[in-house]
Amino acid sequence: MKVALVYNEKVETLAVVKALEKLLDSRKIEIDPENPDVVITIGGDGTLISGFHKYQNLVDQIRFIGVHTGHLGFYTDWRNFEIGKMVDNLTKKQPSSASYPLLELIITTGSGEKKKLLALNEATIKRVSKTLKADVYIRDQFFESFKGDGLCVSTPTGSTAYSKSLGGAVIHPRLKALQMTEIASINNRVFRTLSSPIVIAPDEWITIKPESDDHYVVTYDGYEFNHKHIKKIEYRISQHVIRFDKYQHTHFWNRVEDAFIGQPKNK
């Protein structure tokens, strides 16, 4: 087995990385950042997202394992003090596998050029200095005319991130669905939106067509794509998935409760 390590530069994280490297070496597990079988991320959910984008060209061939140096995350199964147990499992135990859907964006510019991007959590479109005006289509059928700060399209795993802060629903990651939420929409006689998040089926897609050629910012998992002439953007469930090796199970709704509610455990 060959593994790659992706981590942030925080002091507590670097200490965990150093200890993990020693454990891997003692078990004869090779660290190979170029051609890994498993990518282990150390930090938090943001670090795992960075690891996904670093290795997205290999996403069909690799699996991910997340180590959290703080509270338990949505993508990270192991805490920093459990790395010994994790390495034991790597060498002795057959993992179960969990796969989650990815968001595919196809951006068409005014010149007809196409740019394809992948996102693990979400993608947004905003206008740089003015209100966004755009027509929204579902399965190439007109749905609404939007006016506001922007639009966000998220995956089920991304539903606990930015989308939730916009009033979106939390969606179980086993559901292959996309959710679109509005960012500060303006409703009047010309621009009329549903003013509610929508969830679309796996065989459907969303197309956003900005009204005018202007400078737009498309974000995907915090990364940016800037372009002055975007003709349309298509959002759909990708044919690719991200896969995780699972050696211990934490119920998704337990993670949600721990992250957002934090009820006393004796209830």
Swiss-Prot record:
Gene Ontology biological-process annotations: NAD metabolic process; NADP biosynthetic process
Give me the Gene Ontology terms describing cellular component: cytoplasm
Q: Does the keyword Ribosomal protein apply?
A: no
| Reactions catalysed according to its record | NAD(+) + ATP = ADP + NADP(+) + H(+)
Enzyme Commission number? 2.7.1.23
Q: What is its main location?
A: cytoplasm
Q: Does the keyword Cytoplasm apply?
A: yes
Gene3D superfamilies, A to Z? Probable inorganic polyphosphate/atp-NAD kinase, domain 1 (3.40.50.10330), Probable inorganic polyphosphate/atp-NAD kinase, domain 2 (2.60.200.30)
Which compartment or compartments is the protein found in?
Cytoplasm
Role: Involved in the regulation of the intracellular balance of NAD and NADP, and is a key enzyme in the biosynthesis of NADP. Catalyzes specifically the phosphorylation on 2'-hydroxyl of the adenosine moiety of NAD to yield NADP.
- What is the protein name given in its UniProt record? NAD kinase
Q: Report the source organism.
A: Lactobacillus gasseri (strain ATCC 33323 / DSM 20243 / BCRC 14619 / CIP 102991 / JCM 1131 / KCTC 3163 / NCIMB 11718 / NCTC 13722 / AM63)
Corresponding gene?
A: nadK
